């Protein structure tokens, strides 16, 4: 029985056959060719390289070990966010002779090992600011022979170790958008081949590296809507009282003089108080001997002077203005001469006379009647060369100039501004040593006149059909003129020092403005535009760097 094999166990022959089969399998396996790496039809691939022609998109089915990719004559126009993120080992990328026009933000995100990036001979007209974000290993970048006219500011900032940059063969427009590049080229350690401007004509064929920074005039300004006051108004007067900033608005539509207070925390105008005024045309605040008064001029129902009582924190009526002297007020001007306070009221009624009032101890008293029966529309006080003057515009004759007589302590007629017989409003400003008048007209052109020593001469005419309001003002060394109209938008002009004229600067959508008021409020420079038909708008003056 010892020679018998156990039941169910393999015999020697079967074991030998199994061993032979295993050996044959090993031989067959050893002769099988290596597996072909994945490769799209438009590409030729090896284990670590890919060369693609006429691709309709960034190829996705590529070997994961690819470190070099070339795209030629691709049929798509934009490289989008993360287009190559599936190739994290990529070290070399060539994009040549493609139809690209735009490369977006984060287009090369995920390529932290990329060292060489060549984007050449394409039709790229724009790069996004963060196109090259994430390329921390990039040492060589070529953007040669594309259609680039500008480059976003600081586009190369993410490229910490960039050694070589090629921007040749582009159509760079050397305007303010390129100023940053000139500054960067002057300080970078990156080697950059010479590049040249294609435009503007004055810089054409100039080397970008050699452009003087002083040739770039890139700082401009703008008036942007800052706050909307949801009510009409016909006058606006800012004033300081007890270190706070306020604004008085005449609002006949709500039968009040509205007082707003500037909130320095919220940086907005807030409701503060109201003075009853059913037909107010002007609310003039005056701070005399630390006391606040508001002269309320009304078309009907009489005009009054109110006093602010700090103990009761309310306005109380202090004084009535004789309705026989002030019948139909249209404008109000307050000023100080030789230490005394005055205000003048322009009377637009046929039987009225513009009147001057003087402060004396506890009230304002009639001091002088000026210019009777001429339907006066506006007043402008001018204190220049030590000679206080009051200019009165009228709808029935040329503006009249009065000069203060210190002997008589009254205004004495000095002459007329004959160039503008029907001015609605009159304002003045100084530029250098010259004095100018701005006169608005409802029909015809508004005029800018310059004082020539003995007379005014016209220097400029501004189209202004339907104008009842204009205002020159100065903001940070820049001089502007706001010119309103009942039939079109408000025009903002800026003074050109070289030409000694105003040039059109900006258009503001203000309906039927009745005044313009410049109001500095901390670091905010504000222009208020009270509207007779719509909302009162507050614009902020901002400085814009076009090279940013």
Swiss-Prot record:
Glycan attachment residues as annotated in the record: 189, 311
Record keywords: Cell projection, Cytoplasmic vesicle, Disease variant, Exocytosis, Glycoprotein, Intellectual disability, Leucine-rich repeat, Repeat, Secreted, Signal, Synapse, Synaptosome
Chain ranges of the LRRNT domain: 31-64
Claim: Nucleotidyltransferase is one of the keywords in the record: no
Main location group: secreted
Gene Ontology BP, a term: exocytosis
Span of domain LRRCT: 170-220
UniProt subcellular location: Secreted; Cytoplasmic vesicle, Secretory vesicle, Synaptic vesicle; Synapse, Synaptosome; Cell projection, Axon
Renumbered ranges of EAR repeats: 222-264, 268-310, 314-361, 363-406, 410-453, 455-497, 501-543
Tissues expressing the protein: Widely expressed, with highest levels in brain and lung.
Disease in which the protein is involved: Intellectual developmental disorder with muscle tone abnormalities and distal skeletal defects: An autosomal recessive disorder characterized by global developmental delay, intellectual disability, distal deformities with diminished reflexes, visible facial myokymia, and distinctive electromyographic features suggestive of motor nerve instability.
PANTHER family from the UniProt entry: LEUCINE-RICH REPEAT LGI FAMILY MEMBER 3, LEUCINE-RICH REPEAT-CONTAINING PROTEIN
Protein name: Leucine-rich repeat LGI family member 3
């Amino acid at each position: 029985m010892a020679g018998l094999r156990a039941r169910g166990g393999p015999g020697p022959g079967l074991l030998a056959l199994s061993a032979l089969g295993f050996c044959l399998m090993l031989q067959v396996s050893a002769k099988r060719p290596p597996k072909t790496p994945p490769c799209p039809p438009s590409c030729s691939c090896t284990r670590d390289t890919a060369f693609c022609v006429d691709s309709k998109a960034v190829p996705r089915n590529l070997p994961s070990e690819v470190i070099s990719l070339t795209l030629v004559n691709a049929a798509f126009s934009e490289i989008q966010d993360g287009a190559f993120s599936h190739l994290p080992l990529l070290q070399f990328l060539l994009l040549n002779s493609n139809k690209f026009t735009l490369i977006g933000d984060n287009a090369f995100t995920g390529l932290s090992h990329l060292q060489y990036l060549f984007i050449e001979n394409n039709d790229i007209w724009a790069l996004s600011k963060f196109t090259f974000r994430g390329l921390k290993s990039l040492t060589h970048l070529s953007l040669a022979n594309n259609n680039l006219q500008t480059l976003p500011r600081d586009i190369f900032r993410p490229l910490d170790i960039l050694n070589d940059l090629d921007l040749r063969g582009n159509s760079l427009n050397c305007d303010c958008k390129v100023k940053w590049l000139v500054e960067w080229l002057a300080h970078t350690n990156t080697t950059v081949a010479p590049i040249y401007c294609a435009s503007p004509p004055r810089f054409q064929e100039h080397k970008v590296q050699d452009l003087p920074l002083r040739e770039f005039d890139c700082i401009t300004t703008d008036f942007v809507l800052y706050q909307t006051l949801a009510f009409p108004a016909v006058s606006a007067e800012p004033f300081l009282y007890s270190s706070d900033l306020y604004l008085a608005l005449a609002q006949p539509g709500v039968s009040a003089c509205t007082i707003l207070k500037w909130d320095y925390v919220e940086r907005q105008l807030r409701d503060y108080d109201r003075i009853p005024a059913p037909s107010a045309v002007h609310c003039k605040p005056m701070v005399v001997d630390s006391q606040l008064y508001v002269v309320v001029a009304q078309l009907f129902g009489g005009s009054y002077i109110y006093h602010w009582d700090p103990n009761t924190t309310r306005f109380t009526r202090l004084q009535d203005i004789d309705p026989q002297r002030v019948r139909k007020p249209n404008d109000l001007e307050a000023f100080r001469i030789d230490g005394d306070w005055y205000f003048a009221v322009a009377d637009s009624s046929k039987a009225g006379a513009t009147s001057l009032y003087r402060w004396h101890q506890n009230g304002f008293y009639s001091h002088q009647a000026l210019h009777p029966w001429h339907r006066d529309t506006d007043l402008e006080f001018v204190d220049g060369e030590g000679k206080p003057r009051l200019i009165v515009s009228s709808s029935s004759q040329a503006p009249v100039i009065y000069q203060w007589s210190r002997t008589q302590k009254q205004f004495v007629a000095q002459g007329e501004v004959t160039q503008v017989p029907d001015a609605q409003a009159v304002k003045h400003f100084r530029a250098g040593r010259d004095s100018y008048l701005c006169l608005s007209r409802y029909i015809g052109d508004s005029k800018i006149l310059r004082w020539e020593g003995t007379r005014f001469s016209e220097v400029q005419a501004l189209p202004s059909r339907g104008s009842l309001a204009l205002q020159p003002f100065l903001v940070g060394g820049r001089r502007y003129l706001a010119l309103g109209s009942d039939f079109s938008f408000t025009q903002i002009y800026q003074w050109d020092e070289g030409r000694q004229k105003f040039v059109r600067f900006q258009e503001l959508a203000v309906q039927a403005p009745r005044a313009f008021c410049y109001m500095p409020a901390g670091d905010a420079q504000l222009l208020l535009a009270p509207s007779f038909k719509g909302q009162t708008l507050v614009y902020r003056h901002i400085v814009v760097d076009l090279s940013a």
